[in-house]
Amino acid sequence: MKNISTLYIMKRLLVSIAIVFISILTVAGQNHSFSLSGKWNFRIDREDTGVKEQWFKKSLDNSINLPGSMPEKLKGDEVTVRTQWTGSLYDSSYYFNPYMEKYRIEGQVKLPFFLTPDKHYVGVAWYQKKVTIPADWKGERITLFLERPHIETTVWVNQQELGMQNSLCVPHVYDLTAATTPGKTYLITIRIDNRIKEINVGPDSHSITDQTQGNWNGIVGRIELQATPKIHLEDIQVYPDLSNQKALVRMNIQSASSTKGEITLSAESFNTDIQHKVAPVHQSFNIRPGDNPVEMELPMGKEFLTWDEFSPALYKLTAKLTNGKQTDTQQVQFGMRDFKIEGKWFYVNGRKTMLRGTVENCDFPLTGYAPMDVASWERVFRICRNYGLNHMRFHSFCPPEAAFIAADLVGFYLQPEGPSWPNHGPKLGNGQPIDKYLMDETIALTKEYGNYASYCMLACGNEPSGRWVAWVSKFVDYWKATDPRRVYTGASVGNSWQWQPHNEYHVKAGARGLSWAGAQPESESDYRARIDTVKQPYVSHETGQWCVFPNFNEIRKYTGVNKAKNFEIFRDILNDNHMGSQSHDFMMASGKLQALCYKHEIEKTLRTPDYAGFQLLALNDYSGQGTALVGVLDVFFEEKGYINAEQFRRFCSPTVPLARIPKFVYANNETFHADIEVSHFGAAPLKSAKTVYTIKDKFGKVYAHGTVGTHHIPIGNLYSLGSVDMTLEAIDTPQKLNLEVRIEGSDAVNDWDFWVYPSQVELVQGTVYTTDTLDAKALAVLQDGGNVLITAAGKIQYGKEVKQYFTPVFWNTSWFKMRPPHTTGIFLNEYHPLFREFPTEYHSNLQWWELLNKAQVMQFTDFPATFQPTVQSIDTWFISRKIGMLFEAKVLNGKLMMTSMDITSQPEKRIVARQMHKAILDYMNSDAFRPAEKIAPELIQALFTKVAGDVKSYTKDSPDELKPKIN
């Protein structure tokens, strides 16, 4: 057995190979095929009368080009406020809020909760084309191949109905043999119905929902007539057996008559710098009419190549059935890969593996459906790999074959799911049609895609309701007994869902998130207490969900089916609140906080013993469910500007140095201490690896450096490398320092900021009058031209409804009905003279936790349009109130500074607040204190008295996470 490196010298060539193989895998073995792409007759059947009126006998009076969807071809209805969407809405204020009236006008509709399609249609549509069957197909089996229709198809050839299919996961294939004669012309009519009917997968399932791809009507991918010999091979399944250096091949010979035949199996690698050819094997068979199951062994030899994330070597298996003068040759792609579980870990080919994943939600705005070509998927997987990931979960949908081909080429571990979120309507395990449908769909997708090495895991879907635990237990039991090529879990679920006792592994929330709402940031803790009692591998469900402010420059990218009119609404709201020019600043500042949260949550996962992996929600944005801007990449998998792949890989990659640090804020009479560990899930152990560290300031001045240690680093996490200590007495001014840890001879490097403040601070009041309200003395001081500092922590009324944590909005405030927090960090001008004594960037960083977390904000809606606070909180983009925690102004004849941060309590313990207090006083006593904006005293007073009122969502229903734990 050899594990070799893949040759990536020419990406275009590799993509070309992949594109060729998409044809080889599904078409090879057929004597003939021809595409039906192009112009089709077309007609919308709004009243569903076409069957009764026998439209299959008539020529349809419109036309459409296929492949494609109705929205893609601008067919369907204009979007109005009466459009019936496929998806849940938990904030219906759009329909009632007077501000939104301009977005509800006919012909000008813009939606805030997901992207707005150009056209929308749910119902029946008919597609029709005249086709001549080639004369040389005589004696062949003839099929109609529809790669991905949506959703239910019924096919007629002339007036003969051939049946109905409704898979959301695999191609619809109809046998036309008995209904056609080669050399003759036929009218093929396809009726497609995209309504949710008896089989309800759930309105929020990513296979159908308007939250992401949209519930479209049409056919995408390949549309073909295909011909194969009537005696042919089908359902070829390859079962790698690495320990015995062979592959077991199971297949079926389909025959119309009794005969004899011989099967020859051979294989060769095709995407590696070392080519490996497998000696062919032969076996003769007596063939009966109908199905003839066949099992053969293919010895791979000692030099076979393995497939994994580091060396994704692939084979092309050729199966040749010879029967007299007829030959049927088929090819399938497979990899010699073993994906197993031992204890609480996954093992790939015997190597312990941690999954670093993201959730894919079928969010492709340009087309409104998942890409059908290999190149597009290869791009996605390579971007994910560049960000340190090796795994992708497909949330309540199964991607097309192109995704599996691309993941095989890149070396990416996939978890497709049944096409269902059986909730918000349907219930799993209650005897509804969804029970049988989900089982049938997972069987079908495994039959279709089961040979792909990247298909490593399977779940039935997302977060079910009903009597679902018993159902998924039977589901897992069936698959464990049926197909050993991958591992199985019942459903991917949130924390309030029950445990699934038969799971081989768990995808569950609960062991995720940051505890910063109640405790200061540190990097010592982990999630072990939450997963200690779990015996199977635990993969975190939908980790992250940290929000960033919208990037309005992104709007121009939406040139296809779905438009970012939600972004246009959010931009209007920001403009109407006189902050339009700050949109990019808000995006960048909130993005820095988002990236910080992802860093610390991922590192917390990596330093947890026996934590098998995580699935981010998500590396890229999610367009629906209110608009969930949770990605460090936009929905197109493109950078936003505040973090790049190299920076992300510092804390998310196969090998990550980790530091357990008790806190990130120090007085200069303390000692900084960090215990250094490593999470290493690379291709091999690291031998004699030397780990070094450096501590420096923002200018690059080095305060300490040295060697942590030299070690043989095995595969796994929690491997201790040593520690770093530094006394801080030499730091006599407030400083941000940075600890960087690097493993020499590798790409593994990581870093952490920490802050040092003087242990002794003198607060000089000078000429400043300090109060906690705008009292009579404050007004008198201002009238006389003096300086006033108002420390109003806990006393603010106007802005009281805005709940601010240090961490940003989770998912979004629309979907979660204004559940706190409501802000996405702060923005400030770091060059403002106030911050000369308070080191900061323009965005939130860990030193701000003491001042920001659960601090009140002040609302400045009534202030002049040009007013900008010194420390500005970034509100949820659905409201974009002008809010902040610190501002300066000219009031009467004097100068005022006011803060809602607590800068005065417990100064001996709260050294950040104490330093901010000093910085404010020193600034106010300096010549630099020259506020530009003049504010009336009445507006200052209103901050203590005015009540804004709560935001209304109007909808009574709510997401499952806000309901009692009934799942």
Please place each PLM-identified region on the residue numbering:
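N-terminal carbohydrate-binding accessory modules
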Residues: 318-384
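Substrate-binding/catalytic cleft of secreted carbohydrate-active enzymes
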Residues: 381-384, 391-633
